[in-house]
C-alpha cells in the first residue's frame, strides 16, 4: 500500500527519494510527496496528486529544492480523498512525518489538539501525529524517550518516518504493525517500507522488528526495542539486482512475470531437492519434529494466496490423508475459532507483510497450535521471522499488483509440502512419492507449453470487449483455480467475474446464463470429467458462450458447437492446477489490454496490503 523512503547522506538526496518512490509505485498509490531539510535548517515540502513523475517535475521546477536529509511517500487514501492537502509529508511547526497504516483513535486525538489550538490542513489521521509530536515533545527527554511516550498514545498499526528541526541531522523511524527496513550505505543510510526501493543505492539491509525505534544518522544507525533498550543492527545482503524491477522489453510487468513462471516454478522445485528427492531441509531443521506432531492443518491467507491454500486442501486430504481447513485471514483473526488438537498453523503471503495474515499468525501463538509454518517469497519479512519454520518460494521480485508467478510458486510449494507430510505419515509409498516428484519436475516444460497459447488467447480476448460479466467454472481441485481466474479478470479488466463449482450451477448461477454471458471453464483429465462435461452441457443448452481450456488427452470428448476450445498438455493432479492457471492469467491480461485498463496498477488496489 503506501510507501515510505527516507535518506540521510552527504549528498543531495532529492533524486534518491524520487527514484525510491518510483520503485514503490507497484504497491499502489494516488499521490506522492517529499520533504527535505535544507542548508538553512528549513523543512521544504513538495506534494502532488497523481504519478511520481508529476512530483518529479514539480521538484525540478523549484529553485534550490535540495538537501542531504529527507523523507518521501506514496499515499493510498484511507482517511481523506486524494488531494495535495491530504498527501504526505505532513508537518507541524518543527516536525515533518510520513506514515503508513491507520491510527484508529485519530478522531479523539484530533479533537483534543483542536481544542488546544492546533490547526489542521488535511483530513488525514497522519497529521494528528505531527501535531502530537509538537505538543508533547520535551527537549529535556532523549529522542527515544520522547518517541516511546508519544507513540504510546496512538492506537492502530503504523510505520512512521520523522525529520525535525529539533534533530536536523537524523531521521527517526518507528515500526508498529507496518514493515520498515533500514538500508546501510557508506556515509549514508536509508529507511523504507520495501528494500526494493533502495536497491539502486545499497544491497545491505536490516529489518526492524515490531515496536522498534531507529535513529538514522549519516554514519550510524541506532535501533532500540519498545522498552528503549539498544539493539545490535543485524545487516544482511539482499541478492536481487535493481534490474529485477525492470520490464526487460515487455509492455507490462504482469506479462513479464507470466513469462517468468517456467523459471520461477522450476527454481522453487529445485530448491527443495537433494539428490533428486524432496528434502525436509528445504523447510527447516525443526520441520520433521513439527510435522510428525501434526494431525490437522489450518491454512490462513488472503486473496490469491487463499486460493492457493484452497487448492492445497484437496492435495493434503487426498494424498497426505490429513484433515485440512482453509481460512481467510481477516475472518479468522477476529473469530473465536476452535483449534483442533495437533493443528499446524500454515500462513501464505507473497510479501510476508500482509496485515491480516500477520496478525492471524500472532493470534495463533496464543492458541493451542503445535506450531507455525509460512510459505513466503520475501526472506526476512515479518511472516518469515515470526513463524517457527518457513518455506521460501523462488518467484523473484513481483511488481504487478495482480499476482502471477507468486501464485504458481505457492502452488508448487504446497505440493511439495503435501508430499513431505504424506511421506512422514506413510500415506504414500516411496514409489508414489518418486512418481509425483517427477511430475513436479516436469512442470517447467508444461508451463512453457501453456504459454504457447498466448497468440490464440489474444485473439479470443476481443470477444470480451463489450462484456461486463463472466462466470468461471471448475470442479474439485480446479474450483480454486477457477476462483483465481475470476479474481485475475476482475482485478485488471474490471469485468465482474464470479467463480462457481460446476456442480453448483443448478443451485442458482444457471439463472445468469444466456447468449451474452461468457462461461470460462477448465476441463482437466481427471475422475470428474464426465460430471464436468455434463455441467457444461447445461450451459451450452441455454445458449451460454463457452470458453474452454481443455487437457489434450480429453479433447475428443469435448464437442460443443459455437464454443471456443483451446487445448494444452496439463499433466496430472500436482501439475495441472499450475498449468491451467497460465491461460487464465493470459486471458485476463489480454482482456485488460482490450479494455484499456492499467494492467500493472489497477484502480483502488495495492500490491502489499499492510493495513486492515
UniProtKB/Swiss-Prot annotation:
What is this protein's gene name? glmS
Keywords noted in UniProt: Aminotransferase, Cytoplasm, Glutamine amidotransferase, Repeat, Transferase
Gene Ontology BP annotations: carbohydrate metabolic process; fructose 6-phosphate metabolic process; protein N-linked glycosylation; UDP-N-acetylglucosamine metabolic process
Q: Which GO terms describe its cellular component?
A: cytosol
Role of this protein: Catalyzes the first step in hexosamine metabolism, converting fructose-6P into glucosamine-6P using glutamine as a nitrogen source.
Under which EC number(s) is this enzyme classified? 2.6.1.16
Q: Which GO terms describe its molecular function?
A: carbohydrate derivative binding; glutamine-fructose-6-phosphate transaminase (isomerizing) activity
Active-site feature positions: 2, 607
Localization per record: Cytoplasm
Keyword Transmembrane helix on entry? no
Q: Which domain of life is it from?
A: Bacteria
Where the record annotates domain Glutamine amidotransferase type-2, the positions are: 2-219
Record field: catalytic activity? D-fructose 6-phosphate + L-glutamine = D-glucosamine 6-phosphate + L-glutamate
Where this protein primarily resides, as one coarse class?
A: cytoplasm
Q: State the protein's name.
A: Glutamine--fructose-6-phosphate aminotransferase [isomerizing]
Organism this protein belongs to: Francisella tularensis subsp. tularensis (strain SCHU S4 / Schu 4)
Subunit relationships: Homodimer.
Q: Which residues form the signal peptide?
A: none
User: Cross-referenced Pfam families, in alphabetical order?
Assistant: GATase_6 (PF13522), SIS (PF01380)
RNA-binding found in the keyword field:
no
The residue ranges of the SIS domain are 287-427, 460-602
Amino acid at each position: 500500500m503506501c510507501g515510505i523512503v527516507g535518506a540521510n547522506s552527504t549528498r543531495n538526496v532529492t533524486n534518491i527519494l524520487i527514484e525510491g518512490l518510483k520503485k514503490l509505485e507497484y504497491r499502489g498509490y494516488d499521490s506522492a510527496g517529499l520533504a527535505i531539510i535544507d542548508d538553512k535548517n528549513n523543512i521544504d515540502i513538495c506534494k502532488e496528486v497523481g504519478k511520481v513523475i508529476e512530483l518529479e517535475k514539480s521538484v525540478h521546477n523549484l529553485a534550490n529544492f535540495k538537501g542531504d536529509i529527507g523523507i518521501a511517500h506514496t499515499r493510498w487514501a484511507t482517511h481523506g480523498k486524494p488531494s495535495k492537502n491530504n498527501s504526505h509529508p505532513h508537518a507541524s511547526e518543527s516536525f515533518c512525518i510520513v506514515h503508513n497504516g491507520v491510527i484508529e483513535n485519530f478522531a479523539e486525538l484530533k479533537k483534543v489538539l483542536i481544542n488546544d489550538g492546533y490547526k489542521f490542513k488535511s483530513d488525514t489521521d497522519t497529521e494528528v501525529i505531527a501535531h502530537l509530536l509538537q505538543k508533547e515533545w520535551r527537549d529535556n527527554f532523549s529522542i527515544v524517550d520522547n518517541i516511546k511516550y508519544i507513540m504510546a498514545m496512538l492506537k492502530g498499526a503504523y510505520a512512521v518516518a520523522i525529520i525535525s528541526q529539533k534533530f536536523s541531522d537524523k531521521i527517526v523511524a518507528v515500526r508498529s504493525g507496518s514493515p520498515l527496513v533500514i538500508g546501510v550505505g557508506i556515509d549514508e543510510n536509508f529507511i523504507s517500507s520495501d528494500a526494493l526501493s533502495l536497491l539502486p543505492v545499497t544491497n545491505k539491509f536490516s529489518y526492524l522488528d515490531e515496536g522498534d525505534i531507529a535513529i538514522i544518522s549519516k554514519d550510524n544507525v541506532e535501533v532500540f526495542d519498545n522498552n528503549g533498550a539498544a539493539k545490535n543492527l543485524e545487516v544482511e545482503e539482499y541478492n536481487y539486482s535493481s534490474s529485477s524491477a525492470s520490464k526487460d522489453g515487455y509492455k507490462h510487468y504482469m506479462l513479464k512475470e507470466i513469462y517468468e513462471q517456467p523459471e520461477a516454478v522450476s527454481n522453487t522445485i529445485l530448491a527443495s531437492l537433494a539428490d533428486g528427492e524432496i528434502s525436509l531441509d528445504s523447510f527447516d531443521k525443526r520441520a520433521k519434529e513439527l510435522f510428525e506432531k501434526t494431525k490437522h492443518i489450518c491454512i490462513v491467507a488472503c486473496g490469491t494466496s487463499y486460493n492457493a491454500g484452497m487448492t492445497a486442501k484437496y492435495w493434503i486430504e487426498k494424498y497426505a490423508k490429513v484433515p485440512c481447513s482453509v481460512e481467510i485471514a481477516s475472518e479468522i483473526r477476529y473469530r473465536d475459532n476452535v483449534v483442533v488438537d495437533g493443528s499446524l498453523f500454515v500462513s501464505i503471503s507473497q510479501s510476508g507483510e500482509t496485515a491480516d495474515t500477520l496478525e492471524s499468525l500472532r493470534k495463533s501463538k496464543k492458541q493451542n497450535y503445535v506450531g507455525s509454518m509460512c510459505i513466503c517469497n520475501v526472506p526476512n519479512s515479518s511472516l518469515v521471522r515470526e513463524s517457527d519454520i518457513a518455506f521460501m518460494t523462488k518467484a523473484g521480485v513481483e511488481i504487478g499488483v495482480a499476482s502471477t508467478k507468486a501464485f504458481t510458486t505457492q502452488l508448487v510449494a504446497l505440493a511439495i509440502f503435501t508430499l513431505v507430510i504424506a511421506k512422514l505419515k506413510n500415506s504414500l509409498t516411496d514409489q508414489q512419492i518418486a512418481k509425483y516428484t517427477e511430475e513436479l519436475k516436469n512442470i517447467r516444460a508444461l508451463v512453457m507449453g501453456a504459454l504457447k497459447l498466448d497468440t490464440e488467447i489474444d485473439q479470443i480476448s476481443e470477444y470480451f470487449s463489450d462484456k461486463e460479466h463472466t462466470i468461471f467454472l471448475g470442479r474439485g481441485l480446479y474450483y480454486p483455480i477457477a476462483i483465481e481466474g475470476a479474481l485475475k479478470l476482475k482485478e485488471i479488466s474490471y469485468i465482474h467475474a464470479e467463480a462457481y463449482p460446476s456442480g453448483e450451477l443448478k443451485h442458482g448461477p444457471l439463472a445468469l446464463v444466456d447468449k451474452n454471458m461468457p462461461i470460462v471453464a477448465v476441463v482437466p483429465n481427471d475422475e470428474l470429467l464426465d460430471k464436468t462435461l455434463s455441467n457444461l452441457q447445461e450451459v451450452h443448452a441455454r445458449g451460454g458462450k463457452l470458453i474452454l481450456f481443455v487437457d489434450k488427452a480429453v479433447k475428443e470428448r469435448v464437442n460443443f458447437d459455437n464454443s471456443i476450445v483451446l487445448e494444452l498438455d496439463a499433466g496430472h493432479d500436482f501439475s495441472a492446477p499450475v498449468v491451467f492457471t497460465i491461460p487464465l492469467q493470459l486471458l485476463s491480461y489480454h482482456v485488460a489490454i482490450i479494455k484499456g485498463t492499467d494492467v500493472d496498477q489497477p484502480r483502488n488496489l495495492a500490491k502489499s496490503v499492510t493495513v486492515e
